[in-house]
């Protein structure tokens, strides 16, 4: 992302900077009210550190094909077109899963990735191991428990096993 000269460091910035500077795999789950800068702050930190950052907006419709890739038709040939998660893994980039609490259980395909183990792409018959520097930041308005007060309609209760990986 492009560096914003007007960006002001706040909140989680210094802790996240230590994690991203180390280039170790350390998945981070950032929660907070809308408009608090969870995603933008993470993107600006990547810009400051000159780290490649791939942001994936998550919705209720997001599935394995959107994240990992799918077969597609190009010039009459069926080829595998890899998704943004695989791109980030192979390039050692920072992957931001934006608004992850809007997702359905279809994002469970990310469990082995969030464990730092890589992923088998069954549609491409290959295993992808994360390159050095790859890590995951997930942002959410809730703590994965849904929204009881109705402020964040559309958020979901997330799988506990998924949440424990952060």
What are these model-derived regions, one by one?
Residues 1-166:
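AAA+ P-loop NTPase catalytic core and its hallmark functional loops
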